[in-house]
Amino acid sequence: MQNGLIYGLEDRPPLKDTLFAAMQHLLAIFVAIITPPLIISGTLGFDVETTSFLVSMSLFVSGIATFIQCKRFGGVGCGLLCVQGTSFSFISPIIMAGAIGGLPAIFGATMVGAFAEILVSRILKYAMKIITPLVSGIVVTLIGISLIKVGITSCGGGASAIENGTFGSYLNLGIAALVLLLIVLFNRSSNRYLRMGSIIIGIAIGYAVSFFCGMVDFGTMPEYSIFNVPVPFKYGVSFDISAIVAFAIVYVITAIEAYGDITANSLISGEPVEGQTFLKRAQGGILADGLNSFIAGALNSFPNSVFAQNNGMIQLTGVASRYVGYFIALFLVFLGFFPIVGVIFSFMPDPVLGGATLLMFGTVASAGVKIIASQQIDRKATLVIAISFSMGLGVELYPDILMQFPETIRNIFSSGITTGGLAAIISNMVIRIKE
C-alpha cells in the first residue's frame, strides 16, 4: 500500500474488488453523463426518440473515451484511472449551435472545434502561459453562470411549460425544490453510499413524486428497438463558423482543466506530477480528450472531458488501478446499447432535472470562483476580471447590443462564454505585456 492506496495504478485487483470499485465510479458519473443531452434536448425541443438516442450515445461514447484514456494507445491517453464523460461546459454553445443549424451544426462544431484541444496538447507548455489559471477561472465561472439560467428554466417547467402557461407553477417549483433539498440532505449524510448516490436518489424520489402528481405519461412512450446500433453521422453534419469558434474557445479551456485533473489524478495515484513522464501523460490525456470529442461528434454525441469527481472516488476507495477503468468503460458501453435507459430518462419532468442541475451548475460557477480566488488578485488581475465579466455578462444579459452587426458576428459574440473568454485571454496578455 502506498499513499494510502489499496491498489496502485498497475495493480490488478480481484474481480470482486474491481467490480465494486467500478460500480462506485459509475454511480458518481452516470447522472453527470446523461444530464447534458437531456438539458439540450429539452431546450431545443427534440422528440423522445431523438432524446433517447442522444442519451444512449452519450453513455456509449463516454465508455469508448474512458477506455482510450485508461488503456493509453501510444501517445494517446493518460494511462491513469481517468474517466471521461459528456461535458457540462459545452451546453450553452451547443444550444446556440442547435438554434442555428440543429444537430448537424452541433456535431460539425464538436468535430472541428476538437482540433483546438488537440493543438493545445501539442503546445501545452506555451498554451499554459496564455491560458493562465486566472483566465480559466473566469471562463469556468461564466460557464456556470450561463448554465444557471438553463437550470432555472428547467425548474420552472422548461420550454413546454412556457408554451402552455404553467411555467413557474407551484407544482413545478415544489418538485424542483424537493429534488434540490433531497440532494443536499443526502450529500450531507455520514453514510458514504448515500453521499455518493445523492443525485441519483434525489432524482429517483423526485421522479416518483412527479409520477404520482400526474406529471409523467408513459402512455405516449414510442416503440423502440431492444438494442441501439451506433450509426455514424445519423443526423448529418454541417459547419457553422460562429458555432465552431464558440466551441474552440471552450475546448481550449477544457484542455487546461484536463491538465489540472490529470495532475490531481497522478498525485492521488502516487505517480509523478513533474518531469518527462508526467508531461507525456498530460499531453496524451489532453490529446485523447480532443480525439474522443471528435469521435463523439461522429457518433452523434457531444464533447467529452475528463471528470474530476472520479479523483475523489479514487481517494475514497483507495483503488487507483487503471484496470478498473476498463470495467467502467464496459458498463457505459453496455448501457449505451439499450434504448430503454434513454427512454426512461426522456420522460423525466423538467423540474426534476432542474432541481438537480441547478445545484450542479452552481457548483461549476463556484469552482470558477475558487480558481480565481487561488490567484493573487492584484491591480492587473482585477482589471482582467472586470473587463471579462463586464463583456461576458453584458452580452449574456442583453444580446440585442449586437443587433447592428452581421449575423455571423452576432452568433459568435452573443455567447457570454465566447465574449468573456476572448476578453479574458486578450486583456490578460495585453495588460501583462503593458506592465
Please tell me what each predicted stretch does.
Residues 1-21, 220-231, 267-284, 426-435:
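Intrinsically disordered, low-complexity non-transmembrane regions of multi-pass membrane transporters
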Residues 16-28, 168-180, 197-198, 212-213, ...:
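Hydrophobic, membrane-embedded alpha-helices of multi-pass small-molecule transporters
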Residues 97-220, 328-435:
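Membrane-embedded alpha-helical modules
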Residues 37-43, 90-99, 125, 149, ...:
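Generic transmembrane alpha-helix signature in multi-pass membrane proteins
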Residues 1-81, 89-99:
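N-terminal signal-anchor module of multipass membrane proteins
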Residues 53, 75-88, 129-138, 195-200, ...:
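Short, non-helical or kinked segments that cap or interrupt transmembrane helices
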Residues 2, 33-37, 41, 178-189, ...:
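Juxtamembrane interface elements at the cytosolic ends of transmembrane helices
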Residues 15, 41-77, 249-322:
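Membrane-embedded helical hairpins/re-entrant loop segments and their flanking transmembrane helices
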